[in-house]
């Protein structure tokens, strides 16, 4: 089957923003105006097409990145609607990895919020071009120009308004297009009766001011246009669009649009901007990967090139296991066999699907640049590469943050034990930030994730989708241990008791390293003091010993172990003996190296009415928080703080009661920090069963 849409007419875009900025509503309107759905779905009514999980429809938040296709002006647009809640950051992360462009949605009242900054950083990491949509222009307190200023100041982006609103709040009635110098008024509630009118006198001055800024921004980036501009010639609309497109794709400009998705204003112009300014797969750098010999190679976005595709999401579905993929090069064909180069396993492509709203459309192939889903893959997980087995390549995987909170779960009945393990396996395959382990001491199943809401929703899904009722323990913090000074230590394992003995002996130097480096190992063995085949087992023993620290049994991180000396026995030495010796040496070294306990510290942002600010700051101080900034705007106080996760359990309930239900907060993992001595003593005592 030949390609139906040329590559230059494909757009792979995401819609991302802070929670409640109106992403899902914007997506719904895009689907309505582009003809995919014939009735508008509403988030608050629980009928949004992209919010298809029961919990999403109940809570009015988007949890999983739903992928949907639509068409506009002869272009094929694949859209991913991402969640705005920080507990679901992995969903944003994995969608950024496979997108070519993003619509960043901002609330015209709230402006740049904490999660907006997180999403922006993720887009920066993958160098994804962005356009901004200032939504909710009909809300009381809406201020388009203030939000443009914040995008420049807080996100350090070159925000270039390409539209300005006509009126705001209840008076918001239309939009001026600064590129084509046309004004549009919306005459009906559905947003389908749009009249082109002369630019109203009320916005003439603003129009001229922002048109001049737009022209100067575009001219500055292009010598030929600058020359034309300086000679006093007008730049044409086509020249402005081409200049904005170049700037957006290069990441030097962010075109800013406005509207109200809920009131059906500005969405068609937003779709025009997706086509005008965001890149096709041909206009972004070719995907890079590693060949089997470690060499870096690129794969061009062409159907004729060897196949390379990235699995960016796995989902349990009533019809089977759905694996969402982005095809970067070549063609993925139904019925073919491909290589999962990450796992080195062959997979059969039994069925291929693209999603249009709730409909699954079966297709025979996915071409370069396409997003779609494969049914029935057995071994492929998030971040794996699918490729041609004759031309193997491994694409860069996803950045997966470490979980920061864990709870113990157990089924309410013994009969549910099997169902629980199947449910947990299925959920952990879908979500790389969700980890399952068994506590070796209590034999309890422990689940770990990115926050309380994350785990709450996963437990809820176990009940709804897998019919497993579970008892859930109190949340536990993922503490870590590290060292503060460099020491030398040795580990000697000798066992002589008839028959073949055991002998392993290592001398190591251990030193602290930069935060976030984990465990590093270096061998400085020379002259065969320890045979080469015993060095890897020594390292393995050290690594395994670091899984349980000397203070309270938490993993030891951020240290470097250097193997400097040792000895061996011709007959009695073995890999196992050196593994045990390595383990003994690291435990001895960590014990001497001034070990300390580390705890996860969260970046917390809180918004409360001004009257409650004193209470909130006092409460944060009591929670060992460090206030990093505060500002007041229109009677709303915004507080930024760093607070240990251990002090934040149940905060959602506490802040509601302290602010009469009017306070909101968001938090995300920031860094690990040393636990104060008095708190650490209590944690250590509890871990040893003294408390």
Curated annotation (Swiss-Prot):
Binding sites annotated in the UniProt record for GTP: 17-24, 81-85, 135-138
CDD domains for this protein: EF-G (cd01886), EFG_III (cd16262), EFG_mtEFG1_IV (cd01434), EFG_mtEFG_C (cd03713), EFG_mtEFG_II (cd04088)
GO cellular component terms listed in the entry, alphabetical order: cytoplasm
Location in the cell: Cytoplasm
Main subcellular location: cytoplasm
GO MF: GTP binding; GTPase activity; translation elongation factor activity
Disulphide bridges, residue numbers: none
Biological processes annotated in GO: ribosome disassembly
SMART domains cross-referenced by the UniProt entry: EFG_C, EFG_IV
Annotated keywords: Cytoplasm, Elongation factor, GTP-binding, Nucleotide-binding, Protein biosynthesis
Any Pfam family matching the protein: GTP_EFTU_D2
Annotated tr-type G domain residues: 8-282
Chain's role: Catalyzes the GTP-dependent ribosomal translocation step during translation elongation. During this step, the ribosome changes from the pre-translocational (PRE) to the post-translocational (POST) state as the newly formed A-site-bound peptidyl-tRNA and P-site-bound deacylated tRNA move to the P and E sites, respectively. Catalyzes the coordinated movement of the two tRNA molecules, the mRNA and conformational changes in the ribosome.
HAMAP family (UniProt xref): EF_G_EF_2_B
Family: Belongs to the TRAFAC class translation factor GTPase superfamily. Classic translation factor GTPase family. EF-G/EF-2 subfamily.
Protein name: Elongation factor G 2
Phylogenetic placement of the source organism: Bacteria, Bacillati, Cyanobacteriota, Cyanophyceae, Synechococcales
Gene, per the UniProt record: fusB
């Amino acid at each position: 089957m030949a390609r139906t849409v040329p590559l230059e007419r494909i757009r792979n875009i995401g819609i991302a923003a802070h929670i409640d900025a109106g992403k899902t509503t914007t997506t719904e309107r895009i689907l309505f105006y582009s003809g995919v759905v014939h009735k508008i779905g509403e988030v608050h009514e629980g009928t949004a097409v992209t919010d298809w999980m029961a919990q999403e429809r109940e809570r009015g938040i988007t949890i999983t990145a739903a992928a949907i296709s639509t068409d506009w002006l002869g272009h094929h647009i694949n859209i991913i609607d991402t969640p705005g809640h920080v507990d679901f950051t992995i969903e944003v992360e994995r969608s950024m990895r496979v997108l070519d462009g993003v619509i960043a949605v901002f609330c015209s009242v709230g402006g740049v919020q904490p999660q907006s900054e997180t999403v922006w950083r993720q887009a920066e990491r993958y160098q994804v071009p962005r356009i901004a949509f200032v939504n909710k222009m009909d809300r009381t307190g809406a201020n388009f120009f203030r939000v443009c200023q914040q995008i420049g100041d807080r996100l350090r982006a070159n925000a270039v308004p390409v539209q300005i609103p006509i009126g705001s709040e209840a008076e918001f009635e239309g939009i001026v297009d600064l590129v084509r110098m046309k004004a549009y008024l919306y005459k009906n509630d559905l947003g389908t009766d749009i009249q082109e009118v002369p630019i109203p006198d009320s916005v003439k001055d603003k129009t001229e001011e922002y048109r001049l800024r737009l022209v100067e921004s575009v001219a500055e980036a292009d010598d030929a246009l600058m020359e034309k501009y300086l000679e006093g010639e007008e730049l044409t609309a086509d020249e402005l669009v081409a200049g904005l497109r170049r700037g957006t794709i290069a990441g030097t400009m962010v075109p800013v649009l406005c509207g109200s998705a809920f009131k059906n204003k500005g969405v068609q112009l937003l779709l025009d901007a997706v086509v005008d300014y965001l890149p096709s797969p041909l206009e972004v750098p070719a995907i890079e990967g590693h060949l089997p010999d470690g060499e870096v190679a690129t794969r061009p976005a062409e159907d004729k090139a060897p196949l390379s595709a990235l699995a960016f999401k796995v989902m349990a579905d009533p019809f089977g296991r759905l694996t969402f993929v982005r095809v970067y090069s070549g063609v993925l064909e139904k019925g073919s066999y491909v290589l999962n180069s990450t796992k080195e396993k062959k997979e059969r492509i039994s069925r291929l699907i693209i999603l249009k709203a709730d409909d699954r459309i079966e297709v025979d192939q996915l071409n370069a640049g396409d997003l779609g889903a494969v049914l029935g893959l057995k071994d492929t997980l998030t971040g794996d590469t699918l490729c041609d087995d004759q031309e193997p390549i491994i694409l860069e995987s996803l950045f997966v943050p470490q979980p920061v909170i864990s709870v113990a779960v157990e089924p309410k009945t013994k009969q549910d034990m099997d169902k629980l393990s199947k449910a947990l396996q299925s959920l952990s395959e879908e979500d790389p930030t969700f980890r399952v382990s068994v506590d070796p001491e209590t034999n309890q199943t422990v689940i770990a994730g990115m926050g309380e809401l994350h785990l709450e929703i996963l437990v809820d899904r176990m009940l709804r989708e897998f019919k497993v009722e579970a008892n859930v323990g109190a949340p536990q913090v993922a503490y870590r241990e590290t060292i503060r000074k460099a020491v030398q230590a040795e580990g000697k394992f000798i066992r002589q008791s008839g028959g073949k003995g055991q002998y392993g002996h290592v001398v190591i130097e251990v030193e602290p390293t930069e935060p976030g480096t984990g465990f590093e190992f270096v061998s400085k063995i020379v002259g065969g003091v320890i045979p080469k085949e015993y060095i890897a087992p020594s390292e393995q023993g050290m690594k395994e010993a670091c899984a349980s620290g000397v203070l309270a049994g938490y993993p030891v991180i951020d240290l470097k172990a250097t193997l400097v000396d040792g000895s061996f026995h011709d007959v009695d030495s073995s890999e196992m003996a050196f593994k045990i010796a390595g383990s003994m040496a690291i435990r001895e070294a960590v014990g001497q190296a001034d070990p300390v306990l580390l705890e996860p510290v969260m970046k917390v942002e809180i918004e409360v009415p001004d009257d409650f600010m004193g209470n909130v700051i006092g409460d944060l101080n009591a929670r060992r928080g460090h206030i990093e900034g505060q500002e007041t705007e229109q009677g709303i106080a915004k507080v930024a703080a760093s607070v240990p996760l251990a002090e934040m359990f149940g905060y959602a309930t506490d802040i509601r009661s302290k602010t009469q239900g009017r306070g909101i907060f968001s938090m995300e993992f920031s860094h690990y920090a040393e636990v104060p001595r008095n708190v650490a003593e209590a944690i250590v005592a509890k871990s040893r069963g003294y408390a």
